[in-house]
Amino acid sequence: SGSGAMKQPSLRRLRPICLSFPEAEGRETWGEATFRVRDKIFCMHIADADEPALWCKAPPGSQDILVGADPKRFFVPPYVGHKGWVGMRLNQRVDWREVAALVTRSYRMTAPKRLAQRLPAD
């Protein structure tokens, strides 16, 4: 449900984080909210009523580390997991600073260098 997805509290928190990056835009794809830069997806919000989640790109090795350290929160998402993407469940108490850090890293990996360089240093 497209309109239902937009009402999710987790998406209301995630959207402004994702749209804060240079040239980032949101678009609904496959019934889910996706966030892109230059038409490449760097973050997706999965609007599952019981278990909303975000999927984003992660550097090599990060997926194993995150999922291994906290499998209740992090998981290997379908379709894109084999590319190293990581999923984070947003149904528990969410550390939105951690979300912002994950999404920022994903944006840096996805955006053209010129745009990524406009972000403040970590």
What are these regions (language model features)?
Residues 1-122:
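Charge-dense, helix-prone N-terminal extensions
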